Structure formats: C-alpha cells, structure tokens
C-alpha cells in the first residue's frame, strides 16, 4: 500500500564496505554500484552522505553524525578484515542509536 505522503528530505548515510583484500575489479564494481545507489537516493530528493568502510572502524566513521538527524542505508555486508562480521554492523548502528535499513543484529547472528 503506497504512503499518502513521502518524505524526501530525510538525510541518508549510505554506508557500504570496500575490502582492500578484494581485487581491483571487485572494488571498482562496488564503487560503481554505490555511486548508482547514491544517485537513485538523490533523485528521490534525499541528501546523501556516502560512508565507505575500508577498515573495521565503522563506529569511528559514524561518530561525527547525529543519529537523530540521519537514517542509515545499510549496504555494508561485513567489516573489512573481519570475516563473518555481518551481525556486528547493525550492532554498531543499534549501540549508536541510528535507525537503519536491513536486518537487525540478532537476526544476522543466527
């Protein structure tokens, strides 16, 4: 069911990972896809701030942003250099108080 009114001014943090261990082709494909996603969000009217996670320092990357002012579009599959860390990503969002897209940490820990 469509919403009667859509909010298009909601600031978005587009969080995505690029692991330095990936090959050049995979890193470039990830950048191109993130750029396309950013463009689509902007086309809908959202101010977008891309946050590229290239090390396992997601929490420090998010520190400058107020969780009451941004929603996180979570496209970060894991923390670089930390295999099987997919449940840690939403755990960080939750601890910092961000609203985010995707499954929560408990679901991803299963």
Residue ranges and their predicted role:
Residues 1-110:
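ATP-binding N-terminal substructure of ATP-dependent carboxylate-amine bond-forming enzymes
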